[in-house]
């Protein structure tokens, strides 16, 4: 029988943040697209990790799992007659890809996966570039999106710039972030740029958030390869080479 705590590599008393952090790390590690040479095992692991996160990230499901195991979620145990399970007819797990997309908010996590450890090493714990602890999923996306985790850091007028050189992780060569804007509902603009080498090619990802609109540009060796606005990929007109 699979132990969901073992799948995520966390203790039974793990906090919700611990569970989110574990899922993020393992989902990126075992995503089938990142393991083409070992796709069958990756798909199995990816599915297990998604199932474990789905159960342990939900207080009600986690409580039932702690008491009755996976059987409780399936409405088992003699037809559920000896306990009151809200999943009497069985709990249906979602598609692991849907869990993955929802967790990362529809963004491409692979272009930012190097945020996980280097920042933790620099600050001793998970902190945003301005030193304020990121909230939400615990990923760094919230720190650059102009949503709640950044909001509390702004006074009537605030500017910020952060830049890192090579961190020796995942081929990262540089990362920079600038942000400025007025207080309250005034204009806000955040720009973050990351550059890394992948198979000898220079991949630059630029994320611009302004007045609630998010624009993500990905360039390969200086040539624009993809453009996403508010999570929707735009068609590129390749008039030039």
From Swiss-Prot:
Q: Which Pfam families match?
A: DnaJ (PF00226)
The UniProt entry, under InterPro entries, shows: DnaJ_domain, DnaJ_domain_CS, DNJB2/6-like, J_dom_sf
Instruction: State the oligomer form and interacting partners.
Output: Homooligomer. Interacts with BAG3, HSPB8 and STUB1. Interacts with ALKBH1. Interacts with HSP70, KRT18 and PTTG.
Provide the GO biological process annotations: chaperone-mediated protein folding
Keywords, in A-Z order: Chaperone, Cytoplasm, Methylation, Nucleus
* GO CC field: nucleus; perinuclear region of cytoplasm; Z disc
Name by which UniProt lists this protein = DnaJ homolog subfamily B member 6
PROSITE patterns assigned: DNAJ_1 (PS00636), DNAJ_2 (PS50076)
């Amino acid at each position: 029988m699979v132990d969901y705590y073992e799948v995520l590599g966390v203790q039974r008393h793990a906090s919700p943040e611990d569970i989110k952090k574990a899922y993020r790390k393992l989902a990126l590690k075992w995503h089938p697209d990142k393991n083409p040479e070992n796709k069958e095992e990756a798909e199995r692991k990816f599915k297990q990790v998604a199932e474990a996160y789905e159960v342990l990230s939900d207080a009600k499901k986690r409580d039932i799992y702690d008491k009755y195991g996976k059987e409780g979620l399936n409405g088992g145990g003699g037809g559920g007659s000896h306990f009151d399970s809200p999943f009497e007819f069985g709990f249906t797990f979602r598609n692991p890809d849907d869990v993955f997309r929802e967790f990362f908010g529809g963004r491409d996590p692979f272009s930012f996966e190097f945020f996980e450890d280097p920042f933790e090493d620099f600050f001793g714990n998970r902190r945003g570039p301005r030193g304020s602890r990121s909230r939400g999923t615990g990923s760094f996306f919230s720190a650059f999106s102009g949503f709640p985790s950044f909001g509390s850091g702004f006074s009537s007028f605030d500017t910020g710039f952060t830049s890192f050189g090579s961190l020796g992780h995942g081929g990262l060569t540089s990362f920079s972030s600038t942000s400025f804007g007025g207080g309250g509902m005034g204009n806000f603009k955040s720009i973050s740029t990351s550059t890394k080498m992948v198979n000898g090619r220079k991949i630059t990802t630029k994320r611009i958030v302004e007045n609630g609109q998010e624009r993500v540009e990905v360039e390969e060796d200086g040539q624009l390869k993809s453009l996403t606005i508010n999570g929707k990929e735009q068609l590129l007109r390749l008039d030039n080479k």
